[in-house]
C-alpha cells in the first residue's frame, strides 16, 4: 500500500475548491485529467455526499465522496478494477490569514490485484511527481474557472 502526501497553497476558498471537486458534470476532465466523461457515472448525489464512478485509460474507481465538513473532504474507494477498499483521498483545508488556503491531500493506494499492486508501487515511488502535477493542474483549473465566474458576475452587475 502506498500513501502519498501532497500540499498546495491557493487563492481559492475551501468552498470554491470543493465546488470544483464535486462538479460531476460533463467536462470534468478539464479539472481532473484522470476523470474522463466516458467513465463518469453518478450513482447518487446529495447535498454533502455522492457515490460516483470515474476513471480513465482502463482504470476506474467507484468513490464515495463526503464533504459534510467544509474543511475536510473524504473520498473512499467502494469498488475498482485496480484499487482495494483501503484506497481513497483525504483533503484538508486550512484558511490562512492572508486569504489563501492551504490544501493538504493524502492519497492511499492499495492494490486490488497484480495490476493495482504494481501501479501502487509506481505511484508510491516515481509516480508521486505525476500526482503532484495533476493536483496542481486541478487547483489551477479551478482557480481559472472561479476567476472566469467572478469576471462574468462583475460584468452583469
Which residue stretches match the model-derived regions?
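Hydrophobic ligand-binding cavity/cleft-lining segments
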Residues: 1-47
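Beta-strand residues in well-ordered beta-sheet regions across diverse protein folds
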Residues: 7, 53, 76, 104-106
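Hydrophobic pocket/interface hotspot
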Residues: 17-21, 65, 75, 103-105
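Beta-strand/loop substructures that line and gate deep hydrophobic ligand-binding cavities in soluble
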Residues: 78-133
